């Protein structure tokens, strides 16, 4: 096989896109190429992403590092400051959750749970109109994500991670959860700011 053929093979169908049970939320699974040096995969390609998911203008990449039991969320930004996110884990393992806050959606109030890890290399796309959070399942996790809107502290909001109406089955004893004081003040789902 010549170099051109090899490159065409590598760049063809290098990401699997699967829409979840909630419309607009997608799981992306890359095709990973392993050899004696390690591995290579294409983490994001604008043209392929837009062909499957649609046009999203990502403007910033963020990264966080957390230890086992850390639960961040459930976060969102209100109104025109709402954010779409493409999230992934580059070290460790997390359980990632997106909650549908779109009142007009047939899945309003429902949630999606996806395990993201350095091993499965999956990504989760969460459109605007959702609350988002994750729980660290490994001793340590490095979590990175793209966003399509600026961080706007005056417009940020959160919902309690253990809200009974949402009913997320986090695989951890509540006493082992590590969260921020701000997240402890999250609203009940019924009092959240919803999207149309």
Give the residues covered by each predicted segment.
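Ligand-binding loop in jelly-roll beta-barrel domains
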Residues: 128-144
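Non-catalytic, conserved peripheral segments adjacent to functional cores
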Residues: 7-119, 138-140, 147-196
């Amino acid at each position: 096989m010549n170099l051109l053929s090899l490159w065409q093979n590598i760049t063809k169908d290098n990401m699997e896109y699967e829409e979840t049970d909630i419309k607009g939320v997608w799981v992306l699974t890359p095709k990973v190429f392993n050899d004696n040096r390690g591995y290579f995969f294409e983490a994001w390609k604008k043209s392929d992403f837009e062909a499957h998911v649609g046009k999203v203008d990502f403007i910033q990449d963020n990264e966080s590092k957390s230890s086992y039991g850390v639960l961040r969320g459930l976060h969102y930004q209100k109104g025109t400051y709402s954010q779409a996110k493409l999230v992934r884990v580059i070290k460790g393992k997390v359980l990632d959750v997106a909650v549908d806050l779109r009142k007009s959606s047939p899945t309003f109030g429902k949630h999606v749970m996806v395990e993201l890890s350095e091993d499965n290399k999956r990504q989760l796309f969460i459109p605007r109109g959702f609350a988002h959070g994750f729980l660290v399942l490994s001793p340590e996790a490095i979590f990175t994500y793209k966003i399509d809107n600026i961080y706007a502290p005056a417009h940020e909001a959160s919902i309690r991670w253990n809200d009974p109406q949402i009913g997320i089955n986090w695989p951890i004893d509540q006493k082992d959860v590590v969260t921020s004081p701000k997240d402890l003040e999250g609203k009940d789902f019924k009092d959240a700011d919803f999207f149309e």
